[in-house]
C-alpha cells in the first residue's frame, strides 16, 4: 500500500470521532492559569492545547508554518465543542487541529515522494513525521484520529531513517506479562558497539520527537540513542503508566547485553520532564547498568505532591496526566491522590544516597519543575551536578544547556 493510500484509508470518515478536549472528563475544571515554560510552550487565550513553539521549531518546523496552520484553525467556521476554544473543531475537517496539521504533513510527504535526492527526501519525510506528531498532540488515550496520525508519523519516520546519515534499527523488546514494545536504535557512523543513551521522553511526546537530540548532540560525539515510547502511547499503548514508571525502560536496559550494536557497559539515561521520573528510578534500581543519568525539567516530586503547584498547571497537561493514568473520569481530588504516589520522594527513593552520577537541568520559576526537584536529585547522588538554564534567549540557552548536558554524559560514557 502506498503512503498516500494509507493516509486515505486511515482518515476515511467512519463515524463521528470524539474531539480531543472532551476525552478526559474531570469534574471540577478550574480557570486556565497563564503559563510559560521552555519545554512545554505556553498557554494562549482561546486555545485548549499549549502552543509549544520552541520544541516544534527545535524539531525543524518553520515558525511561519506554525502560524499558517494556526491561522487555518482560527478562521474555521465549523462547529466546535467549546466556541471559546479555536482548537476544538468537531470531526476530521477544515479547522480541526488533527486535520490541519496532518494536511500540512501530507504536503511534505508528497515532496518526499517526488524528491530524487535521497538525503533531501529523508529530510522531507522527517518533517512530515514531526507534523503528524503535532497533529496527534497531546496524544490522549482514545483519540482515534490522533492515533491514526501517530501511525502515519511512525511510517514517515521509518522512511526518513532509511535516507538520513547513520543507521536506525527498529527493535522489539519482550516485556513479561504483556505485549512487546518497539524502540528505535539510532547509530552514528563507524563501527559499533556504541556507547548509548536510553531516552526517557515526556508524557506529551512520542519517541520519534527526539531525532534532533540525536543528530545535533549525540551523533557528533559517536554516541547512539535508543528510544521507546512512554507507557500508554505509541508503540507502548498497551501498557498503562503505573507507579512503577520505569518498568518498560528497565526491561529494555536488561536486554541491552543481547544487542550487538550497543556497548552495554557504557549506557546512560536521559529524561525530559516526566521521563526524568523514569530515569531517576533507573538510577536507583539499575545503578550497575548505568554510567550516568541526566534530567531536564524533571517531574519527580513537587508537581506530583503539591496542590498549589498542580493548580498552576494548564488544563491540557492535567488531562495528559489523567489520560496516562487511565483516570478519564476522575475528579481533581482523586487525580491528586493518585499523582502523589508517583513522587519518587514519597516512594522512598529520592533523598536516599544513590551511587549513579546524576545531573539535573532546570529553569527558574518553571511551573512544572521547581529548582527544589533538581536539587533533590543532585543532592541524592554521590556525584551530582546542578545546572541552571537561563530563560532568555530561550532557544540559544536551550541549545547551550543541551550541549553542556551531552558533554557531561560523554565524559561518563567515553
UniProtKB/Swiss-Prot annotation:
Organism whose genome encodes this protein: Shigella flexneri
Enzyme class: hydrolase
Protein name: Esterase FrsA
GO molecular function, one term: carboxylesterase activity
Protein family according to the UniProt entry: Belongs to the FrsA family.
PANTHER family per UniProt: DIENELACTONE HYDROLASE DOMAIN-CONTAINING PROTEIN-RELATED, ESTERASE FRSA
InterPro entries named in the record: AB_hydrolase_fold (IPR029058), FrsA (IPR043423), FrsA-like (IPR010520), FrsA_esterase (IPR050261)
Gene transcribed to yield this protein: frsA
SUPFAM superfamilies, A to Z: alpha/beta-Hydrolases
Pfam family, one: FrsA-like
Lineage of origin: Bacteria, Pseudomonadati, Pseudomonadota, Gammaproteobacteria, Enterobacterales
Amino acid at each position: 500500500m502506498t503512503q498516500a493510500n494509507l493516509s486515505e484509508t486511515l482518515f476515511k470518515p467512519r463515524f463521528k470521532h470524539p474531539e480531543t478536549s472532551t476525552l478526559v472528563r474531570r469534574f471540577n475544571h478550574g480557570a486556565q492559569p497563564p503559563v510559560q515554560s521552555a519545554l512545554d510552550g505556553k498557554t494562549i487565550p482561546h486555545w485548549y492545547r499549549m502552543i509549544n513553539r520552541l520544541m516544534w521549531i527545535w524539531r525543524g518546523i518553520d515558525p511561519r508554518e506554525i502560524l499558517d496552520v494556526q491561522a487555518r484553525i482560527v478562521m474555521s467556521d465549523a462547529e466546535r465543542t467549546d466556541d471559546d476554544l479555536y482548537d476544538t473543531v468537531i470531526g476530521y475537517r477544515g479547522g480541526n487541529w488533527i486535520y490541519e496539521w496532518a494536511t500540512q504533513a501530507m504536503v511534505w510527504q508528497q515532496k518526499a515522494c517526488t524528491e530524487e535526492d535521497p538525503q533531501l527526501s529523508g529530510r522531507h519525510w522527517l518533517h512530515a513525521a514531526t507534523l503528524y506528531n503535532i497533529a496527534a498532540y497531546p496524544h490522549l488515550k482514545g483519540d482515534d484520529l490522533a492515533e491514526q496520525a501517530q501511525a502515519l508519523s511512525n511510517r514517515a519516520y521509518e522512511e526518513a531513517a532509511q535516507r538520513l546519515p547513520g543507521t536506525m534499527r527498529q527493535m522489539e523488546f519482550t516485556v513479561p506479562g504483556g505485549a512487546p514494545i518497539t524502540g528505535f536504535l539510532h547509530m552514528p557512523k563507524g563501527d559499533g558497539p556504541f556507547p548509548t543513551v536510553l531516552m526517557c521522553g515526556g508524557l506529551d511526546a512520542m519517541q520519534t520527537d527526539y531525532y534532533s537530540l540525536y543528530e545535533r548532540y549525540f551523533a557528533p560525539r559517536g554516541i547512539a540513542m535508543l528510544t521507546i515510547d512512554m507507557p500508554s502511547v505509541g508503540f507502548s499503548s498497551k501498557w498503562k503508566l503505573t507507579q512503577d514508571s520505569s518498568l518498560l525502560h528497565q526491561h529494555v536496559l536488561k536486554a541491552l547485553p543481547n544487542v550487538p550494536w550497543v556497548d552495554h557497559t557504557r549506557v546512560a539515561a536521559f529524561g525530559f520532564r516526566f521521563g526524568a521520573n523514569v530515569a531517576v528510578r533507573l538510577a536507583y534500581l539499575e545503578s550497575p547498568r548505568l554510567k550516568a543519568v541526566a534530567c531536564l525539567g524533571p517531574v519527580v516530586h513537587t508537581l506530583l505532591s503539591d496542590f498549589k503547584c498542580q493548580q498552576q498547571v494548564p488544563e491540557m497537561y492535567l488531562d495528559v496526566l489523567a489520560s496516562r493514568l487511565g483516570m478519564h473520569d476522575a475528579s481533581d481530588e482523586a487525580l491528586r491522590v493518585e499523582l502523589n504516589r508517583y513522587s519518587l520522594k514519597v516512594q522512598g527513593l529520592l533523598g536516599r544516597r544513590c551511587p549513579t552520577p546524576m545531573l539535573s537541568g532546570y529553569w527558574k520559576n518553571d511551573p512544572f519543575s521547581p529548582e527544589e526537584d533538581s536539587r533533590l536529585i543532585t543532592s541524592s547522588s554521590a556525584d551530582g551536578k546542578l545546572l541552571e538554564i537561563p530563560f532568555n534567549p530561550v532557544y540559544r540557552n536551550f541549545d547551550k544547556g543541551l550541549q553542556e548536558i551531552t558533554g557531561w554524559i560523554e565524559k561518563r560514557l567515553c
